[in-house]
Amino acid sequence: MRFFALFIYRPVATILIAAAITLCGILGFRLLPVAPLPQVDFPVIMVSASLPGASPETMASSVATPLERSLGRIAGVNEMTSSSSLGSTRIILEFNFDRDINGAARDVQAAINAAQSLLPGGMPSRPTYRKANPSDAPIMILTLTSESWSQGKLYDFASTQLAQTIAQIDGVGDIDVGGSSLPAVRVGLNPQALFNQGVSLDEVREAIDSANVRRPQGAIEDSVHRWQIQTNDELKTAAEYQPLIIHYNNGAAVRLGDVASVTDSVQDVRNAGMTNAKPAILLMIRKLPEANIIQTVDGIRAKLPELRAMIPAAIDLQIAQDRSPTIRASLQEVEETLAISVALVILVVFLFLRSGRATLIPAVAVPVSLIGTFAAMYLCGFSLNNLSLMALTIATGFVVDDAIVVLENIARHLEAGMKPLQAALQGTREVGFTVISMSLSLVAVFLPLLLMGGLPGRLLREFAVTLSVAIGISLVVSLTLTPMMCGWMLKSSKPRTQPRKRGVGRLLVALQQGYGTSLKWVLNHTRLVGVVFLGTVALNIWLYIAIPKTFFPEQDTGVLMGGIQADQSISFQAMRGKLQDFMKIIRDDPAVNNVTGFTGGSRVNSGMMFITLKPRGERKETAQQIIDRLRVKLAKEPGARLFLMAVQDIRVGGRQANASYQYTLLSDSLAALREWEPKIRKALSALPQLADVNSDQQDNGAEMNLIYDRDTMSRLGIDVQAANSLLNNAFGQRQISTIYQPMNQYKVVMEVDPRYSQDISALEKMFVINRDGKAIPLSYFAQWRPANAPLSVNHQGLSAASTIAFNLPTGTSLSQATEAINRTMTQLGVPSTVRGSFSGTAQVFQQTMNSQLILIVAAIATVYIVLGILYESYVHPLTILSTLPSAGVGALLALELFNAPFSLIALIGIMLLIGIVKKNAIMMVDFALEAQRSGGLTPAQAIFQACLLRFRPIMMTTLAALFGALPLVLSGGDGSELRQPLGITIVGGLVMSQLLTLYTTPVVYLFFDRLRLRFSRKNSKPVVEI
């Protein structure tokens, strides 16, 4: 009593406290970063190693395996995957959430150092690592085009100057430069000319390497001067290499230009990049795992004027893709939804109270509670994102509830003629415990979420804390500011036997009278209501089992990503043509704004594309509808497939799969994996629940197998090393020397001129100089035949792995797809030597599914414990919790009606309903217990009177929560796919709960009261008179 009086009778202090909360909130709002979702990126480090010319199997066994054994000893590694292709190996390490990325990077470097002695010689550089996830979509793509500069020169400028400058920006984690490679001097050998001159390829390589050296020459000095010695020991351009003498034939000098074409070119000619049909160099920028995407993009954009000022006029620098506009638009939509929710809630209050002054009180309480929450969000290190702003939107209906309960009870005393200050004090005292019970039990719902681990726990933590803080501030405001404003702003009215009612008031009176009549009938037919109650419990179980489920709603971020997978024997020239064809098909779609893509490198038959769609306001279709439309056109392209998927704000795992979801096959036997993977992939491709089924197992690449006749080689004086060196020199794009320039280092690359290596006959032109100096053709001691060979070898842990990726057809949920895959694996009878499991997002979905029911039960148990403590009763909490089944039925039916799968967002809605709908029962039970204690009423009379007396605040609080969530259901535009499931769940649950709990709660109350009396009689002892 004294606590409430302290704030009611000291209005200045109360107002200043509320103002302080508001000012702190405004300051916190201005300092909060902006993001699409809470920070849920796993710490990921990518290790790269190269050995030019080595086959995928050689890279896997000699490079990947030693590194994996060393890296696998690092603490906190969630998953380790590797992919080895022609000349390169990439290992992805995904760490636990609580692992510091910088500490992990130090451990990775130590592991690389430990494995160094086990790696093969001839590697051009030590393995390197980068703190970035290559499977993440770039946050920004910059393109460089030029009419006069070559692609190699553009690539050099981009990688040497632009990438270095951008990498220094806070938040930038990794920059992939694609579309070409660094400049190089390329030596294209003529095998016939070499044979005629008797010059071996090793001799050419050694002559070039010896002619281009960089060694210190020292200095000369006398008593006065010092001279640094400098020589022309370096050759830097193709023109300087052409006259180089590599051999003497009968006294005549054989120069490099006589036996080879020497050109200024690039290190790897098998690379191509394009933007909107123009050749381009792409800078694909990814953020650090812990970085904020908006702040990072803003930092890059702020640097762009400086970057444009430093580039030559012949280069055009453009932004081809930027993730931030759709993120900002989505957050703006949420902010508008929040404003609409606040307005609707205030309108509900006004319609019920029909007083401007009375409406002003919750109109002040709501913004103070919401704005004050921003201060706590800042202190907790949160961000303004879709989930935290959705929490505030939902909180609108919650925070007004406390104010409504207090305000309505005070208004009831004022209508009875009590003086304002007395009414404020008395009304607050009566409902103070009720308000505290409602708020604490609501906060209790979120305690299990705060203890939840993994990605779902990280994702929901900000939502739970934000909502809990808003409820806590609302509780303080409703017990301090609200009664103070009621006492000083509202006026008492003369009691009337039949007060005048207009509009909504008349409707409310009619509803209350009708409710009273129907409630009397219900209390006389309790068994029927009990059957209905048990029916809702059973229906909950059935609906939860039957409803389609997914991990997270499919987002439309306005960006698509596509992976190209062509025939495994395709040439680079043909692959570049496929890239152009696919880009034309996509560019012609009316919903597409920009297309960039690249191909080449170690995997000639693959490529990547990034598509920026027009803003949502300029297109009618969703991203998924656009993909469905393009899929039909793209399927007509022979010899290659392009798999499109919408870029999501959440992507789990480090695999660069060509679809959104993955199923990984593991085996200790590579042969067993290669036997069963095609069978499993074929079976999964036939499932209607899956689309775009593809695999990263590529073991049908064209290979030319050379079989050495070792006896003949020994007789001819040739060793295997010389033969292998011949092949590497001829066909491996061998980097044989380094050219040092002020800004970078470039390579001299040697191979047979492409004019002489167009077919298998090129092998017939190869020869080796034996120990006697004679030229021995390769065909003398080797035979060759075509065969199939893998284009890549993949590992997970230390096991051979193959990942089957898939998308979902429109109208199919992830649960339906996973069930179909598990069923198919069982039907196929896959042996125990091949193990299958979901990975990436599908794996997290499986883990979340296993914990959903536990989470809901834990939330209900927590609420029960809190209510039991508050009421000092085992029974009354059960009465209050009896409101939950009807809410669950309403939520699940609403999701079915809107064809929305049960996702993590819908789970949040269910958790919220646990907190919302019990408020009705709390208000009923509190007044019924008070009526029994102080009024001497029977349980039936008490609960009947409580239901009628609390009918108006129950309607007000329910409608406030309903109208607070309604804008989420009706919202469109960017990010609506996240907001709508939450709104649908809450609105559906509230409507069904309101219809049923007004009748089931009093029946359950009476049932438990009779049960209590029955047990009390059994346990009572007879009184013995003395």
Curated annotation (Swiss-Prot):
Q: Which SUPFAM superfamilies match?
A: Multidrug efflux transporter AcrB pore domain, PN1, PN2, PC1 and PC2 subdomains, Multidrug efflux transporter AcrB TolC docking domain, DN and DC subdomains, Multidrug efflux transporter AcrB transmembrane domain
**TM annotation in the entry:** 15-35, 333-353, 360-380, 387-407, 431-451, 463-483, 528-548, 853-873, 897-917, 953-973, 984-1004
Which Gene3D superfamilies does the UniProt record give?
Multidrug efflux transporter AcrB pore domain, Multidrug efflux transporter AcrB pore domain like, Multidrug efflux transporter AcrB TolC docking domain, DN and DC subdomains, Multidrug efflux transporter AcrB transmembrane domain
Organism field? Salmonella gallinarum (strain 287/91 / NCTC 13346)
Q: How does it sit in the membrane?
A: Multi-pass membrane protein
On assembly, the entry states:
Part of a tripartite efflux system composed of MdtA, MdtB and MdtC. MdtC forms a heteromultimer with MdtB.
Q: What is this protein called?
A: Multidrug resistance protein MdtC
Q: Which residues form a coiled coil?
A: none
Please give the Gene Ontology molecular function terms for this protein.
xenobiotic transmembrane transporter activity
Family (UniProt): Belongs to the resistance-nodulation-cell division (RND) (TC 2.A.6) family. MdtC subfamily.
**Cellular location of this protein?**
Cell inner membrane
Q: Which InterPro entries match?
A: AcrB_DN_DC_subdom, Acrflvin-R, Multidrug-R_MdtC
Keyword field: Cell inner membrane, Cell membrane, Membrane, Transmembrane, Transmembrane helix, Transport
Q: Say which domain of life the source belongs to.
A: Bacteria
GO terms for cellular component? plasma membrane
